[in-house]
């Protein structure tokens, strides 16, 4: 009886080895496991895949940083992958901008200074377009110049004026939006743009923001001080305003107004402006330079902020202020290699009280 049982088990073992160890059987087993994981454990699989992608991004970022610090030409190797780049350097301000992985470049920037005569405060602007480049180009080519003219008039008779930097900024931003909407509506152009403007005088820094471009300042202690706050649909104040206007927000990778726009305020975007769910009203803040004694500020499109936190960006730039672009070029390249899919524009402005800053 025992011998018969052993013989039967031995026979079953040989049969199982014959079938289970065949290549086609192993292949079918792998396919079955993959299908079972996909249909019954989708979330777990997605988590593993996302973690793997994040790990790859981190490794690529580390490689990029090593190459960026390589004085033997590492940056030139990286730049070969960019379809288009723009750069600017003058006195205490430097800008670096790349098209990156996008098919079109919709970022714009502008710098207007009069360091010799000081007929107006220095004007720095970042404009991150969407739905085409029309809106960003329109605002970039008109708003800074309009601000310059009004600020020059204001400086001539400041003591007797009822205006201020804040009121001039608000008036001109709203005016340029109305003017642009008329033209975009006629041509059925649905383009829009953010608007981040900083006015730098001897004692004050005034920053106006519409959208999700962002400004951050490094104070005397190395702290990251926010100069603006992103206008996002998920924010309670913005969400309530959109709901009161009869609109809605929905999630499609990110929270969007009417399921379309990933910011709650912008210039342009005439279809959403007609519904009153997106507005052009800027938030404006003024900072006392004597109190903060800042070293530098960063103004950038959201391509940077998708890859860096405020604090991380300040630390990164602080370590690279001696570079030709004050670290702007390096942080743009690092953002690209962290996987940012967007256009990336970074402006770094060094303040005159910094020991490393050229005379403003």
UniProtKB/Swiss-Prot annotation:
Protein localization: Membrane
Lineage, top ranks: Eukaryota, Metazoa, Chordata, Craniata, Vertebrata
Broad class of the protein's primary localization: membrane
Residues annotated for Mn(2+) 1 binding in this entry: 128-129
PANTHER family per the UniProt record, alphabetical: PROTEIN PHOSPHATASE
Keyword Metal-binding: yes
Residue intervals of the PPM-type phosphatase domain: 92-351
Reaction(s) this enzyme catalyzes, per UniProt: O-phospho-L-seryl-[protein] + H2O = L-seryl-[protein] + phosphate; O-phospho-L-threonyl-[protein] + H2O = L-threonyl-[protein] + phosphate
Subunit-level organization: Interacts with MAP3K7/TAK1. Interacts with MAP3K5.
Role according to the record: Acts as a suppressor of the SAPK signaling pathways by associating with and dephosphorylating MAP3K7/TAK1 and MAP3K5, and by attenuating the association between MAP3K7/TAK1 and MAP2K4 or MAP2K6.
Cofactor remark from the record: Binds 2 magnesium or manganese ions per subunit.
A GO term, aspect molecular function: metal ion binding
One Pfam entry name: PP2C
Span of the signal peptide: none
EC number(s) from the headed UniProt entry: 3.1.3.16
PROSITE patterns hit by this protein: PPM_1 (PS01032), PPM_2 (PS51746)
Keyword set includes S-adenosyl-L-methionine: no
Cytoplasmic side: 43-360
A single GO cellular-component term on record: extracellular exosome
Protein name: Protein phosphatase 1L
Tissue: Ubiquitous. Highly expressed in heart, placenta, lung, liver, kidney and pancreas.
Keywords tagged on the record: Hydrolase, Magnesium, Manganese, Membrane, Metal-binding, Protein phosphatase, Transmembrane, Transmembrane helix
Membrane topology: Single-pass type I membrane protein
Cofactor: Mg(2+); Mn(2+)
First-tier enzyme category under EC: hydrolase
Residues involved in Mn(2+) 2 binding: 128, 302, 342
Organism expressing this protein natively: Homo sapiens
């Amino acid at each position: 009886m025992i011998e018969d049982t052993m013989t039967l088990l031995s026979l079953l073992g040989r049969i199982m080895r014959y079938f289970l160890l065949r290549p086609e059987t192993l292949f079918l087993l792998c396919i079955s496991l993959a299908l079972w994981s996909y249909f019954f454990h989708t979330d777990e699989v997605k988590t593993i895949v996302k973690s793997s992608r994040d790990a790859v991004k981190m490794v690529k970022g580390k490689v990029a940083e090593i190459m960026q610090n390589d004085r033997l030409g590492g940056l030139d190797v990286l730049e070969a992958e960019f379809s288009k780049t723009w750069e600017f350097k003058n006195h205490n301000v430097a800008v670096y901008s790349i098209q990156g992985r996008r098919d079109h470049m919709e970022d714009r920037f502008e710098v207007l200074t009069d360091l010799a005569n000081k007929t107006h405060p220095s004007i720095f602007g970042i404009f991150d377009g969407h739905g085409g480049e029309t809106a960003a180009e329109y605002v970039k080519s008109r708003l800074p110049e309009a601000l310059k003219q009004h600020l020059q008039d204001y400086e001539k008779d400041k003591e007797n004026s009822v205006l201020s930097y804040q009121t001039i900024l608000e008036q001109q931003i709203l005016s340029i939006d109305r003017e642009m909407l008329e033209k975009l509506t006629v041509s059925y152009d649905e383009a829009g743009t953010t608007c981040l403007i900083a006015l730098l005088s001897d004692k004050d820094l005034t920053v106006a923001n519409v959208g999700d471009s962002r400004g951050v300042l490094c104070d005397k202690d190395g702290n990251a001080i926010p100069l603006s706050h992103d206008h996002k649909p998920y924010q309670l104040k913005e969400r309530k305003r959109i709901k009161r206007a009869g609109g809605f927000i929905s999630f499609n990778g990110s929270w969007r107004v009417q399921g379309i726009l990933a910011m709650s305020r912008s210039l342009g975007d005439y279809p959403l402006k007609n519904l009153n769910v997106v507005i052009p009203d800027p938030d404006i803040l003024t900072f006392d330079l004597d109190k903060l004694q800042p070293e530098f500020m960063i103004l950038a499109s959201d391509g940077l902020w998708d890859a860096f936190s405020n604090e991380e960006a300040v630390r990164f730039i602080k370590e690279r202020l001696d570079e030709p672009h004050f670290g702007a070029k390096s942080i743009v390249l690092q953002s690209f290699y962290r996987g940012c899919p967007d256009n990336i524009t970074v402006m770094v402005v060094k303040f005159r009280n910094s020991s490393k800053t050229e005379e403003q």
